[in-house]
């Protein structure tokens, strides 16, 4: 957003279209290898990703696909085919086909915006999108306080001119002003379309106040059927943000950490000590409840001190 490079709100929101950016990682890596970058105060290489420097598809590092208006979230479909960009200040979502963007980089697509295969109205204040693996997208509508379920293929058909294509499948009220959203394994090839979680930025009357910070609301929704069903509310900290849902059997748990995985770990309290190299001082110590291997240590004013603490409780 703010492709206008504005400072005031009225300037930042003056353009009807902004941009969704796609980065050509291979070209960026080649540019860095060739020394075509700058540094600003550190050694991190910074390539030129400005719009002016990336208009020629043959050399572009970045593709600027135009989207309306002050776009917010962009999310990839489980098959990796489409990227859905939410309009925020536009009641639309823009569906961009990745292969067409790659065709533009390769000189096979003349107009970059021809990678837009759908741009449809879904509601007021679209922010983020999740997927069920069955071809449906779920977008949060901040101003409408809703989640809208819509079918991507039907949206593409509608965009092409089929006005009989009913792309909106369902809507459900949430409480209130939803932002981040995710479905079970949503942006992976294993999306299973069972559950949806949504972070609502305001709970309003949903929970009793418990102190200076009023709890906001995360809601769990069943998306296994045609209609969405609200299952549960959960009070959460303010401004709930990104989260994922995944199957617990893919987690490989550990009961005890392997100290060999940490090259700086102190494996024995006898290795504790203060080690000086000029003004650089490294302090190594261990802890094992309720004590530390060193209760105190002394350094000089002006020293640069690195403290390495390893817990040896079992």
Model-predicted segments: where are they?
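Predominantly soluble domains enriched in secretory-pathway, periplasmic, or organellar proteins
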Residues: 1-273, 280-282, 304
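Extracytoplasmic copper-binding redox domains, predominantly the cupredoxin/blue-copper superfamily
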Residues: 263-314
